[in-house]
């Protein structure tokens, strides 16, 4: 049970181009797969990728995947969910699964520039929305990441390619 399972949605809105939400997630996942394939002969585990939609509509894409295709979650040992509320700043680890000692240790040991603090989880749980990770966080270990600086770009016409940050994208991976 050591598969990595990043997932992402394409959740752009009518006015947003989706370069940040969720171009960041898509790009990070594709680059992660590209890098992982270079070392596939050294790995003992696999990688699964799930792209969902309708996160903003009560997590409907992830709920459907979990309800109707539950077998895709078999043998998944870790979920990485990539979010982007803003285009700038570090990729914050803002939520983990319960009993997270091993997950936090994995992050601390392997992230080049880990960035998190316990208040992030408190703030996140006060927000009116959730993430796809909500559906599995009680059953599969995982981590939720997001850049949040300049959230005024979120779901607006400012969510475009002119406002992406290569430094922020690089911090995710």
PLM regions and their residue ranges:
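Soluble extramembrane regions of membrane proteins in the secretory/endomembrane system
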Residues: 1-173
């Amino acid at each position: 049970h050591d598969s990595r399972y990043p997932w992402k949605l394409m959740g752009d809105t009518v006015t947003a181009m989706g370069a940040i939400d969720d171009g960041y997630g898509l790009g990070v996942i594709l680059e992660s797969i590209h890098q992982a394939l270079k070392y596939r002969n050294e790995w003992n585990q696999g990688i699964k990728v799930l792209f969902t939609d309708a996160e903003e509509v009560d997590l409907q894409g992830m709920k459907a995947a979990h309800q109707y295709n539950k077998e895709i979650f078999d043998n998944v040992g870790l979920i990485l969910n990539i979010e982007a509320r803003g285009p700038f700043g570090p990729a914050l680890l803002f939520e983990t699964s319960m009993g997270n000692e091993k997950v936090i240790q994995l992050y601390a040991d392997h992230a080049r520039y880990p960035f998190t603090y316990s208040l992030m989880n408190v703030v996140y749980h006060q927000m009116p929305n959730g993430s796809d990770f909500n559906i599995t966080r009680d059953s599969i270990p995982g981590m939720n990441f997001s850049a949040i600086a300049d959230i005024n770009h979120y779901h607006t016409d400012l969510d475009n390619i002119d406002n992406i940050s290569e430094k922020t994208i690089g911090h995710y991976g």
